[in-house]
């Protein structure tokens, strides 16, 4: 008798009595009503098909992609580059005429850097620009040196390191000139600039941030 009185109501009995179902039935009814409100344009059959296959995303969801860290390729060290002789100029390429186009490019580069070299251009301005400029391709001459054999050597600058200049002469000879204890001149369009090698012992990439004194010592 007790089991008959307290048995669960069927869906029809609940609807007839206007009684809300409890437990699992109530949860299912709530979910279906919620989905119907959330997807008003979707037909019941389409909604049912979606539920059978996968979860329905009710809000806009952005999946954050993990950024994979790119491994930087490790380059060769300075020692390895020297051992591989990557900076050596091959004998068949040690020809003055081969680098004349480089000199013409350098002259145009300096003209652009100085906004045009005119007769009324201030020499101090040109000097300041040249001290920070890339000199590869410039024609340089040794005017003073503690080693007399260096004096008078003139050629196109091919390579520059912290302590030396490598130049190619008109006789197609590659010369290595130390900066220390040497004074060099650079000429372009009638303007002559002096470089005191002892104060110039920097890599070309470091000179752009270097502050040179307006009046340096002329001692070798």
From Swiss-Prot:
One of its GO terms (cellular component) is nucleolus. Keywords: Nucleus, Phosphoprotein, tRNA processing. Component of ribonuclease P, a ribonucleoprotein complex that generates mature tRNA molecules by cleaving their 5'-ends. This is Ribonuclease P protein subunit p29. Belongs to the eukaryotic/archaeal RNase P protein component 1 family. The modification Phosphoserine is found at residue 10. The keyword Transferase does not apply. GO terms for biological process: rRNA processing; tRNA 5'-leader removal. Component of nuclear RNase P and RNase MRP ribonucleoproteins. RNase P consists of a catalytic RNA moiety and 10 different protein chains; POP1, POP4, POP5, POP7, RPP14, RPP21, RPP25, RPP30, RPP38 and RPP40. Within the RNase P complex, POP1, POP7 and RPP25 form the 'finger' subcomplex, POP5, RPP14, RPP40 and homodimeric RPP30 form the 'palm' subcomplex, and RPP21, POP4 and RPP38 form the 'wrist' subcomplex. All subunits of the RNase P complex interact with the catalytic RNA. Several subunits of RNase P are also part of the RNase MRP complex. The keyword tRNA processing applies. It is found in: Nucleus, Nucleolus. GO terms for molecular function: ribonuclease P activity; ribonuclease P RNA binding. It comes from the Eukaryota. It holds the Pfam family RNase_P-MRP_p29.
